[in-house]
Amino acid sequence: TAGLPPVLKNYSEFQKFMRTLQKANAIQSIREVWWDIRPHPGFGTVEVRVCDAVPTIEEMVNLAALIQCLTVGLSDHYDDGSQLEILDPWIIQENKWRATRYGIDADIIINDTGALQSLRGTIVDIIEKLLPIAEKLQCKNELNNLINMVENDDIPYKRQMAEYANSKDYIDIIKLYINELKK
């Protein structure tokens, strides 16, 4: 992807940003913007690129449920007039790098004083806070599946690494994913 989107205060700023890119001939349409997450005005949706890397249908459904619950939760905050704490862009970028480098075992920065928290714990905490929303959306099982994956270290990239450590053959990783997708 092209990484994280710029910090924009509201949808009007997003629209202005897109118009500027188009007028400057940087893009022809929103489809040429490949951020990790972006709104798609034509569909009225939010696109999240991480789903492209999920190897099984079940895991993709679990992740889609999480994204749906996050969207509803954030929308509820907006409707209530609540302000979310927003980290500085450099902290968000650093946390993305840490997650990319260290995976689920990363420690992420949670404030501007440099306090750290485990990514694993943060994920579980967020999912647990979303369980009431998941109950309403009838996707609580999917969120519980994600908690189990995180707590049991059953993460796709770790399965890849374990397969390679066992066989020393990249073809076996492809076979693993083909077999998982068939389930």
Give the ranges of each region predicted by the language model.
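C-terminal accessory/tail domains of diverse enzymes
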Residues: T1-K183
